[in-house]
Amino acid sequence: MLEQGLLVTAGVAFLISVALSPLFIPFLRKLKFGQSIRDEGPKSHQKKSGTPTMGGIVIYVSMMVTTLIMAIKFNNLGAEVSLLLLVTFGYGLIGFLDDYIKVVKKRNLGLTSKQKLIGQLVIAIAFFLIGKGQAFHTYIMIPGTDVKFELGWAYFVLVLFMLIGGSNAVNLTDGLDGLLSGTAAIAFGAFSIIAVAQEQFGVAIFCMAVVGAVLGFLVFNANPAKVFMGDTGSLALGGAIAAVAILLKQELLLVIIGGVFVAETLSVIIQVISFKTTGKRVFKMSPLHHHYELCGWSEWRVVVTFWSVGFLLAVLGIYIGVWM
């Protein structure tokens, strides 16, 4: 019965997202909340300048409303769901402030790196202090085995790294129409299956609400995008998926299921290190999706390829996390 409820959860979130987006997009246009495009980016992206951004608000509202309704209905509104909503709201708020400064204050870089990091740290610390011993414990498990390693307070550092790193990695992936919406839906879908296998139905409800919300948003975010989620959406999704992995004790498996996000981040790190040490670039441009664009791939081809890779990694992650 609850498994059917998960499909209903995704369906409800999808419908709310699809219903809200056509109302919210004109509102963003009226406020002139348009995306600015970097001059150093691919030339084909210049035509996207002015496309409404901060659409992540639609994802958040759709996900939050659906999660609360379904979690209450199935009596699963516990510490885990509360923590997930806290992290999603906190990182979404940081993203909102970042977007707001960009589009209203006309400061292209938004929040400073220091301001953003402080905000991310505060949310991550709150997550750890509230959840430790209640929603999760301080050990990690080797995926596909019963082997566990107690980390003690070193787990605190891991939580900070995962939440901050996860939010930034997902944020880097949001560079092409529909890219993040699709890969996020796939990753959260994979974790929902693992959550069901662990009988963590509150986490599963949250994951399926996210799946429905981002797929509904994808209807308007697919190429050519009518709206972007902005940092409001990408930082929230990144923090949320890291929190889900922590609550499911699948910290290491996040590297596989979130492999697309990891690859995007590594491409930036490699590019920076290479340029600073040798003066040469490994990629034509980073993050990785822009490299393939500059190699002559169409935007849609890059997106579908990354979705496909994300799907294969998700299947591998489910196999390791459930059947091994």
From Swiss-Prot:
Which family, according to UniProt?
Belongs to the glycosyltransferase 4 family. MraY subfamily.
Broad class of the protein's primary localization: membrane
Q: What does this protein do?
A: Catalyzes the initial step of the lipid cycle reactions in the biosynthesis of the cell wall peptidoglycan: transfers peptidoglycan precursor phospho-MurNAc-pentapeptide from UDP-MurNAc-pentapeptide onto the lipid carrier undecaprenyl phosphate, yielding undecaprenyl-pyrophosphoryl-MurNAc-pentapeptide, known as lipid I.
Catalysed reaction, written as an equation:
UDP-N-acetyl-alpha-D-muramoyl-L-alanyl-gamma-D-glutamyl-meso-2,6-diaminopimeloyl-D-alanyl-D-alanine + di-trans,octa-cis-undecaprenyl phosphate = di-trans,octa-cis-undecaprenyl diphospho-N-acetyl-alpha-D-muramoyl-L-alanyl-D-glutamyl-meso-2,6-diaminopimeloyl-D-alanyl-D-alanine + UMP
What InterPro entries does the record tag this protein with?
Answer: Glycosyl_transferase_4 (IPR000715), PNAcMuramoyl-5peptid_Trfase (IPR003524), PNAcMuramoyl-5peptid_Trfase_CS (IPR018480)
User: Which organism does this sequence originate in?
Assistant: Bacillus mycoides (strain KBAB4) (Bacillus weihenstephanensis)
UniProt keyword annotation of Plastid present: no
The record's keywords, sorted A to Z, are: Cell cycle, Cell division, Cell membrane, Cell shape, Cell wall biogenesis/degradation, Magnesium, Membrane, Metal-binding, Peptidoglycan synthesis, Transferase, Transmembrane, Transmembrane helix
NCBIfam families (UniProt xref): mraY (TIGR00445)
Question: Its Enzyme Commission number?
Answer: 2.7.8.13
Q: From which domain of life does this come? A: Bacteria
Q: Which parts pass through the membrane?
A: 5-25, 52-72, 77-97, 122-142, 149-169, 176-196, 201-221, 227-247, 253-273, 302-322
Which named protein is this? Phospho-N-acetylmuramoyl-pentapeptide-transferase
* Membrane-protein topology: Multi-pass membrane protein
Q: Which GO terms describe its molecular function?
A: metal ion binding; phospho-N-acetylmuramoyl-pentapeptide-transferase activity; UDP-N-acetylmuramoyl-L-alanyl-D-glutamyl-meso-2,6-diaminopimelyl-D-alanyl-D-alanine:undecaprenyl-phosphate transferase activity
- Cofactor(s) the protein needs: Mg(2+)
Q: Name one GO biological process term.
A: peptidoglycan biosynthetic process
Q: Report the PANTHER family cross-referenced here.
A: PHOSPHO-N-ACETYLMURAMOYL-PENTAPEPTIDE-TRANSFERASE, PHOSPHO-N-ACETYLMURAMOYL-PENTAPEPTIDE-TRANSFERASE HOMOLOG
